[in-house]
C-alpha cells in the first residue's frame, strides 16, 4: 500500500467470493488512506478554555521533571505532597479491619450522600464539639475533601462571582473556583503575625461580586492555627457582608504545643451559612482511601435552593466509594492514635520541630514555627537570594540535590520568596534533606 502520492491497485475483475482476507484488509486500508488524503490531517484536539487559568503545581511540571530524573535512575526525595503512607505511617489496624470486614456489604451503590452509619458518626462528632443542631442530613460523604470542594463550588458559583481565598492557600481552592466560573481573590495572611489572616485586607477586597470566604485552619501550607478571636473576626466579616463561609479543617487533629482548633461553625449562629470540610486522610493516615465529608451549618432555609445543588451533583456521581465509608464510624468513635504522633516524642511533632529548627539555621532563611499540619513554609530573604522565578528555583534544587519541594507561588503567594516542605520523613532523612537544601542555597548567595 502506498501513501497519498501513490496508488493502491487491486484486481477489479476479481470476484468478491475469491477476495482473500488479506485483500479485504488492504481494501479497507486503501479506503482509509484515500479519505485521509481528501480531508487532510486530523484537526488538533485542545483542552477546554475553562482550564486556561487552572493550576495545581503540587503535582505540576516540577513533579514531571522529578519523574524524568527517576527514569534516568536518580533517587528523588519527594517533599511536595502531604501523603503519610510512603514515609512509614500506617492506618490504624481497626480501620483496615473494618473495611475488610464490610467488603461483602460494599459491592453496591450507597445513598448518594453516604451510608447512614458514616453520616451519623460525623454528625455525632460535631455534636460532641458543641454543634448540637447538626443532623444526619447535614452531612455529605465524599471521595476526599477535594471532590466535595469542587462539587459545592460548582453548585454555588455563577460566572464572575468572587470568592476570597487566603494567600498562601491550598491551590485546589483557587483552581476549583476558577474551574467553576468564579474569580478567586486572594487576601494576605501576615507572616509577621504568625500567618494570621489580615482582616483589614479581607475587608478591602470585598466587592458587590464577593459571595464567599474560604478559611483554611489549621493552615496548609503555613501550619498556622487560628485563635478563637481570629475565627470570630473572620465570621463577623462574613456576617456583615452576607458571605458564605467555606471552612477547610482537614488538619484539625494535627496540633502541636497545646494549640487548640476552633471549629468555624461554632461561631456562625443563625445568620451565616458555613460549609465545613474534613475527613480521614491526614489524621488517620489513609489518603488513598478517599474518605472526606461536608457538614452544613447555619441558616439552611434561606439556602434551600443552593443546597439542592450539592444534592443534585451528589446524585450524579452516584455515591462515594462505599468501602472507605465503613472506616468513618470506626475512626471517629475509636482510639485516637493521632495523639501518639502530635505530642513530644511523636513523629509528627518531632519532625516538625526539627525541620523548623534546621531551616532557621540556614543563612538567609526564616520560618514561622508551625502550630499544626504537616508542613513548613520558609522564606528566602530577597536581600540574600536574588530569586526572580521560584518555580525555576525549585527545579534547579531538584536537579542539583534530588530534593522535590513546591514553590511558594504555587500556593498563590504574592512574591517568589517561599517554598513549602513536607515534614513527613523520619528525622535522619529530614536532616539530610534540609542539609542538601542548605548546601544548594550556599551556591545561590
What does each model-identified segment do?
Residues 36, 128, 386-388, 395-405, ...:
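PLP-dependent enzyme catalytic core of the Aspartate aminotransferase-like
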Residues 43-144, 151, 331-335, 443-445:
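N-terminal small-domain helix-loop-helix segment of the aminotransferase-like
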Residues 69-72, 180, 240-241, 401, ...:
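Helix C-cap/helix->beta junction micro-motif
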Residues 96, 267-346, 353-357, 441:
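Conserved core segment of the aminotransferase class I/II
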Residues 155-177:
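Conserved PLP-anchoring active-site segment centered on the Schiff-base-forming lysine
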Residues 185, 190-262:
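Active-site phosphate-binding strand-loop segment of PLP-dependent enzymes
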Amino acid at each position: 500500500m502506498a501513501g497519498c502520492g501513490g496508488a493502491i491497485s487491486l484486481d477489479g475483475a476479481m470476484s468478491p467470493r475469491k477476495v482473500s482476507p488479506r485483500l479485504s484488509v488492504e481494501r479497507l486500508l486503501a479506503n482509509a488512506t484515500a479519505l485521509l488524503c481528501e480531508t487532510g490531517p486530523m484537526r488538533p484536539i485542545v483542552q477546554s478554555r475553562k482550564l486556561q487559568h487552572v493550576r495545581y503545581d503540587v503535582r505540576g511540571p516540577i513533579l514531571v521533571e522529578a519523574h524524568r530524573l527517576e527514569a534516568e535512575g536518580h533517587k528523588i526525595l519527594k517533599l511536595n505532597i502531604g501523603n503519610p503512607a510512603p514515609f512509614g505511617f500506617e492506618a490504624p489496624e481497626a480501620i483496615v479491619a473494618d473495611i475488610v470486614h464490610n467488603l461483602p456489604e460494599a459491592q453496591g451503590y450507597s445513598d448518594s450522600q453516604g451510608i447512614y452509619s458514616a453520616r451519623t458518626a460525623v454528625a455525632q462528632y460535631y455534636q460532641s464539639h458543641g454543634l448540637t443542631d447538626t443532623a444526619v442530613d447535614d452531612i455529605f460523604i465524599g471521595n476526599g475533601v477535594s471532590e466535595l470542594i469542587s462539587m459545592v463550588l460548582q453548585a454555588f458559583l455563577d460566572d464572575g462571582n468572587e470568592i476570597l481565598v487566603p494567600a498562601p492557600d491550598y491551590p485546589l481552592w483557587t483552581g476549583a473556583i476558577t474551574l467553576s466560573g468564579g474569580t478567586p481573590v486572594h487576601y494576605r495572611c501576615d507572616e509577621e503575625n504568625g500567618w494570621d489572616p489580615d482582616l483589614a485586607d479581607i475587608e478591602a477586597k470585598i466587592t458587590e461580586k464577593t459571595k464567599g470566604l474560604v478559611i483554611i485552619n489549621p493552615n496548609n501550607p503555613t501550619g498556622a492555627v487560628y485563635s478563637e478571636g481570629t475565627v470570630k473576626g473572620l465570621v463577623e466579616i462574613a456576617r456583615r457582608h452576607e458571605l458564605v463561609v467555606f471552612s477547610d479543617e482537614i488538619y484539625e487533629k494535627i496540633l502541636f504545643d497545646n494549640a487548640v482548633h476552633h471549629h468555624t461553625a461554632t461561631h456562625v449562629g443563625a445568620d451565616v451559612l458555613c460549609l465545613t470540610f474534613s475527613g480521614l486522610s491526614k489524621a488517620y493516615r489513609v489518603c488513598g482511601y478517599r474518605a472526606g465529608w461536608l457538614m452544613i451549618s447555619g441558616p439552611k432555609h434561606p439556602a434551600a435552593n443552593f443546597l439542592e445543588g450539592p444534592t443534585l451533583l451528589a446524585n450524579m456521581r452516584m455515591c462515594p466509594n462505599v468501602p472507605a465509608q465503613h472506616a468513618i464510624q470506626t475512626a471517629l468513635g475509636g482510639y485516637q492514635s493521632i495523639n501518639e504522633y502530635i505530642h513530644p516524642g511523636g513523629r509528627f511533632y518531632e519532625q516538625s520541630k526539627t525541620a523548623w529548627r534546621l531551616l532557621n539555621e540556614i543563612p538567609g532563611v526564616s520560618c514561622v514555627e508551625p502550630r499544626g499540619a504537616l508542613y513548613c513554609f520558609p522564606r528566602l530573604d530577597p536581600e540574600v537570594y536574588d530569586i526572580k522565578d521560584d518555580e525555576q528555583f525549585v527545579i534547579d534544587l531538584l536537579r542539583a540535590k534530588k530534593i522535590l519541594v513546591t514553590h511558594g507561588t504555587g500556593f498563590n503567594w504574592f512574591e517568589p520568596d517561599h517554598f513549602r516542605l513536607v515534614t513527613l520523613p523520619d528525622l535522619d532523612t529530614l536532616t539530610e534533606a534540609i542539609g542538601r537544601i542548605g548546601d544548594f542555597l550556599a551556591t545561590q548567595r
